Design a protein with these regions (language model features):
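Short, acidic/turn-prone active-site loops that include or flank metal/cofactor-
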Residues: 11, 75-81, 238-240
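Hydrophobic/aromatic residues located in beta-strands of well-ordered beta-sheets
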Residues: 5, 51-53, 98, 129, ...
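Short phosphate-binding loop-to-helix
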Residues: 52, 58-118
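N-terminal glycine-rich phosphate-binding loop and ensuing alpha1 helix
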Residues: 2-54
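Short, high-confidence coil segments that cap the C-terminus of an alpha-helix
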Residues: 48, 94-95, 123-128
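Conserved alpha/beta core of the MobA/IspD/sugar-nucleotide pyrophosphorylase nucleotidyltransferase superfamily
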Residues: 168, 182-265
Length: 265
């Protein structure tokens, strides 16, 4: 199976302009731009046939080419990473599976992506897959504190009995009544922003209008659900280090600490 990992990256992030080029120090104190760290995370994945940085910005493209990454240039009309992957796919050779490893997902363990590839290899009917982690009650309380402080703390997902996503939200779902967090494990599953798509699912996504739910939540994957394209939720184990994305400038210190904890140079 020909698996292409695509790393969509844009310079004009609404929350953090220039984010892909932000320098982050690793375990040894060496600073590398975010896009390079995301690329290095991608090349550690077993089973990938190719890795490409996908962007519409020459500053990002030049930086990526400088550390040896293959680059696919896309138009500035792409509204999100999934649309960017769909456009980039048109410039690639025959591909059986596309993995969208978002440009700020530098701490994503290779095993998460490998689990998606394995799931899609075995479930031939699956069109889209994405990982999620079941959270401990203490981790949910930390997310509640982030939310109360007005910061984006993460996206949560609920799924049906067959493991297909019912909904994703930037709010904590499901509702947690009194006592829901009394045990060690919670009913909350944190979504990890990595996706595996069949090419036909990407084409269908690009041809589908933006949905109201997608706009309200600011979550691109909801377009699949609104269009009736199921998303398989693959449960993965929470890593030993904090799994953070660079969403806000305030996240830099925590991400550098996580890089050090993971032993990533």
């Amino acid at each position: 199976m020909n698996v292409a990992i695509l790393i969509p990256a844009r310079f004009e992030s609404s929350r953090y302009p220039g984010k892909p080029l932000v320098a982050l120090k690793g375990a040894s104190g060496v600073a590398k731009p975010l896009i390079q760290r995301s690329y290095e995370a991608a090349v550690r994945v077993a089973g990938a046939s190719s890795v490409h940085v996908v962007t519409d910005d020459l500053r990002i493209a030049d930086q990526a080419a400088g550390f040896g990454a293959a680059v696919v240039m896309t138009s500035s009309e792409c509204r999100n990473g999934t649309e960017r992957c769909a456009e980039a796919l048109q410039h690639l050779d025959s591909t059986d599976l596309v993995v969208n490893l978002q440009g700020d997902a530098l701490l994503t363990p290779p095993g998460f992506v490998e689990a998606l590839i394995e799931h899609m290899r075995g479930a031939v009917e699956a069109q889209v897959a994405t990982p999620a982690m079941r959270l401990r009650s203490g981790e949910v309380r930390a997310l509640q504190a982030e939310e109360a402080a007005g910061r984006v703390g993460g996206t949560t997902v609920v799924a049906d009995g067959a493991g297909r996503a019912l909904y994703f939200s930037k709010r904590l779902i499901p509702h947690l009544p009194d006592g829901a967090l009394d045990g060690e494990m919670s009913p909350v599953r944190l979504h990890v922003g990595v996706y595996a798509y069949r090419p036909e699912a990407l084409a269908a996504y690009a041809a589908t209008p933006v949905s109201e739910l997608e706009m309200l939540e600011g979550l691109e994957q909801l377009r699949f659900l609104v269009a009736g394209i199921p998303i398989a939720v693959v449960e993965v184990e929470t890593p030993a280090f904090a799994l953070r994305e660079l969403n806000n400038p305030e996240d830099v210190e925590a991400i550098e600490a996580a890089l050090a904890a993971a032993g990533l140079e």
